[in-house]
């Protein structure tokens, strides 16, 4: 009925919220631009499907150090059946996939950023390694913060992203520990569990949960959302 122009089937009252709102906002943005029709509700999925391919190319290129391999990854994803279908369907999975891959791409960029800062630290002091010292405390790391925001948006699309957040937060800390060990921190490497672990927890886990909570701003700011008055009732 919707494709024939009858949108009266849409309910005026709020219904059960199965998933968080970010992906639904994006679908609604396409409908706002192009109307409640098959193109309007697919538009955002198409855009994010294309962006997913671009981010994948950049991620694989950064990991492999090869433009060719990055390009091949993009080609393979372009012709992947699931990517093809999800980019043309008004479902949430393509949005969550994009935000998750973006989060991982930012973490990989942070890994490179962190190692470059360690190398610069050694170069400025004209030393070969840390010599058993812990090294610089790099707390504000822009790429890691960007990753936390991306994870938060992924959580704001579907809760499934929580598993990826937990896994990659631990992996990011492991990368830091490995980098300090390679730089010669020696026995002080274990201090990274707290001195790098706490900033990582704040930048990834806490920030992503703050972003996730922020995605519900419209629910908190209005009174007509599903179960909005459950406490009073």
Predicted regions and their residues:
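Membrane-integral, polyisoprenol-dependent glycosyltransferases
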Residues: 1-225
């Amino acid at each position: 009925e919707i494709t024939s122009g009858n949108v009266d089937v849409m309910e005026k009252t709020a219904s059960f919220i199965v998933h968080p709102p970010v992906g639904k906002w994006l679908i609604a943005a396409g409908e706002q631009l192009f109307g409640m029709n098959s193109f309007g509700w697919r538009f955002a999925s198409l855009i994010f499907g294309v962006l997913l391919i671009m981010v994948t190319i950049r991620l694989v290129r950064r990991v492999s150090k090869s433009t060719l391999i990055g390009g091949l990854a993009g080609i393979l994803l372009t012709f992947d059946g699931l990517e093809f279908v999800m980019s043309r369907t008004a479902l949430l999975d393509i949005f969550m996939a994009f935000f998750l891959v973006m989060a991982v791409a930012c973490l990989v960029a942070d890994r490179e950023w962190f190692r470059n800062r360690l190398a610069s630290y050694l170069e400025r002091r004209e030393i070969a390694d840390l010599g058993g010292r812990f090294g610089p405390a790099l707390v504000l790391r822009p790429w890691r913060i960007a990753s936390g925001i991306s994870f938060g948006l992924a959580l704001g699309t579907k809760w499934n992203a929580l598993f990826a957040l937990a896994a990659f937060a631990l992996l990011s800390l492991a990368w830091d520990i490995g980098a300090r060990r390679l730089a010669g921190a020696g026995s002080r490497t274990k201090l990274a569990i707290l001195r790098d672990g706490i900033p990582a927890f704040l930048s990834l886990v806490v920030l992503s949960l703050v972003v996730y909570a922020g995605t519900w701003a419209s629910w908190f700011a209005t009174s007509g959302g599903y179960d909005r008055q459950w406490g009073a009732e």
